[in-house]
C-alpha cells in the first residue's frame, strides 16, 4: 500500500510547507514539509532556503522512508485512510518510535479502536494534540467513495 493523494494532502497540511529554515515547536531546525536533519540530507541550519522543486524532492524522499516503515511494521489489514493516518503519525514521531508504539501493537493485534486511541498518547508537546486527534479520526473514518 502507498500513501494516497488524500493522505499526502493531509500530511502536507499538518506539517506545513516552508522554503526557509525555521525552528519547530520543540526547537528543531526544520524546512520543507517537516524535514529535519535527522531524516537525512539536506542538513537544516539557520538561513537555509530551498526552492519549491527542492522541497518536493525532499518530501518525496522523506515520505518514502516513512511509508516503508509503516509497511514494515504493520501486519494487520487496514484501509487507505488508516494507512495514511499511520504514515502521518510515523512521519511525525519517527520510524523507531512508531515501530515500538502501543498504537501499532494494538492495531496489529486486531484492536483498531484501541490503536486509534493509543495514537493520542503521542501528545508532546501539547500543541500536537490537535494533530493526533485528526490522525486518529482519519484512521477510523473511511474515505468517501
Model-based region annotation:
Residues 1-28, 35-40, 44, 50-68, ...:
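Long, amphipathic alpha-helical surface segments
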Residues 82:
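Structured, non-membrane catalytic/scaffold regions adjacent to prosthetic-group chemistry
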